[in-house]
Regions:
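Conserved N-terminal structural module of periplasmic/extracytoplasmic solute-binding proteins
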Residues: 2-7, 11, 16-100, 279-282, ...
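Extracytoplasmic/periplasmic substrate-recognition and gating elements
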Residues: 59, 65, 223, 230-233, ...
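Extracytoplasmic "Venus flytrap"/periplasmic binding protein-like
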Residues: 59-123, 154, 159, 251-252, ...
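A structural signal for short loop-to-beta-strand junctions that line the ligand-binding cleft
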Residues: 79-80, 87-90, 118-151, 181-182, ...
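Periplasmic solute-binding protein
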Residues: 97-107, 125-163, 169, 186-207, ...
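Glycine-centered hinge/linker elements that transmit conformational signals in sensory
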Residues: 171-176, 210-237
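Long, aromatic- and glycine/proline-rich binding clefts that accommodate carbohydrate-like moieties
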Residues: 325-381, 405-407
Length: 408
């Protein structure tokens, strides 16, 4: 009797266990299915940009649920956990310049794995160039940024804006006195000095990761730029330079578009113009161009391809870029947006469009990580310590080569 009862209890337990397993399995499949339709996107953008993206991506509900998560340490976090599908995001919205780092880590998927390459022809060529690493496009461009030539109309009238660097130099000589400066910039910061170097056809770093600090063109740029630096304050920090312009102590500057709302809020009638042409070369000052857009992690491309494609296609809507231009002065990456009044009526956006004709996409190769410090030290030696340009450039070139070699 006891054996029959025990046998019956064991049978019931087995049935219960199997049923529980089946229920658990069904529940697990539901979770997995739901997870396939949830996309987490990391970003580091200001609220105005994030709100436009969020509003557009909410249109994908209920098919796709997008979690837009602001991450202040985005780049370092991706280096640490980008290969862990349990911790990493599915996509991230950021500038193009870290593409090479993450591609070499093996954590990125080419955009063309999901969107056919021919459909990307709607984007400006230089935005796609910025998004390309070793022949693969790893970013869907959304908007871009360049530095701008800005001036305070209280001092510099529209018809006085220098067309060439020699005109700018003359203006600086005539208007630099008594605590006022005709022109200021972060002259010893690589991101700003790059415009002068590029304008001389020099280079900080080539597309293949080779530094060009000791080239004839780069040395010529540093020597020419030095005479402008001599008419600027020695302090080159962001806060100091921008405060001089914002407070009306500097008549003009080269700065990012993010400065415009600040100086307007301060009551300035600010103008933006094309970069002055360098008399020595016939090229305008040609700053770096940073392209902001969406990137796809390999794990998401493999396991959530349908949801990822829907997100990408949502962000390919030109209205997103137009809305970003209106909300935050972002310059659209799509050519067609420049046919729309909402874009062409924005002088800051159109000034970036003009500057982009000659801007150089910031290098996206991993070697660029070591160049910022090397070039910063070079600029300090030349501009602030008065060291010989040629000798300093050659020493910086050797340092860069050694640091790059240690990376490989």
């Amino acid at each position: 009797m006891r054996k029959k009862v025990r046998s019956k209890l064991m049978s019931m337990a087995l049935v219960f266990t199997m049923a529980a397993g089946l229920l658990s399995g069904c529940g697990g499949n539901n979770v997995a299915e739901a997870d396939k339709n949830t996309i987490t996107i990391w970003h580091d953008k200001e609220d105005a940009v994030a709100e436009v993206l969020q509003k557009k991506l909410e249109e994908l509900e209920p098919d796709v649920h997008v979690v837009l998560e602001k991450k202040s340490d985005l780049t370092e976090s991706l280096k640490m956990i980008g290969s862990d599908p349990k911790a990493a995001p599915d996509m991230y919205f950021f500038a193009h310049d870290k593409i090479g780092v993450y591609a070499e880590m093996g954590i990125l998927a080419p955009i063309t794995d999901i969107i056919p390459k021919e459909e990307l022809d709607v984007y400006m060529d230089n935005t796609l160039e910025a998004a390309t690493y070793k022949g693969e496009i790893y970013q869907l461009p959304v908007y871009y940024e360049t530095l701008l030539f800005m001036y305070n109309r209280r001092y510099m009238k529209d018809d006085e804006v220098p067309k060439t660097t020699e005109e700018l130099y003359q203006y600086m000589q005539d208007n630099t006195a008594g605590g006022h400066y005709g022109f200021v910039e972060q002259h010893s910061t690589p991101y700003y000095a790059a415009g002068w170097i590029n304008g001389f056809d020099g280079t900080i770093l080539s597309d293949d990761g080779t530094p060009g600090l000791d080239s004839e063109e780069t040395i010529a740029a540093l020597k020419y730029h030095k005479k402008f630096v001599d008419l600027m304050p020695g302090e080159t920090e962001y806060a100091t330079v921008n405060t001089l312009f914002k407070e009306g102590m500097a008549h003009s500057t080269i700065a990012g578009p993010w400065l415009v709302p600040t100086v307007r809020a301060n009551g300035m009638d600010v103008g933006v113009a094309s970069m002055p042409v360098i008399d020595e070369t016939g090229n305008p000052i040609s700053p770096y161009m940073g392209v902001q857009g969406i990137h796809v992690l390999k794990n998401a491309a493999e396991n959530k391809k349908s949801a990822v494609e829907k997100v990408l296609r949502a962000l390919m809507d030109p209205e997103v870029e137009v809305d970003l231009a209106k909300a935050s002065g972002c310059a659209p990456a799509m050519e067609s947006c420049y046919e729309m009044d909402e874009v062409t009526s924005d002088e800051v956006v159109m000034a970036m469009r003009d500057t982009a004709e000659h801007a150089i996409p910031m290098p996206n190769v991993p070697e660029m990580d070591v160049m910022w410090t090397v070039v910063g030290n070079l600029l300090t030696d030349v501009n602030m310590s008065g060291k010989d340009v040629t000798e300093s450039a050659k020493a910086a070139q050797q340092e860069a080569l050694q640091l790059i070699e240690s990376m490989r």
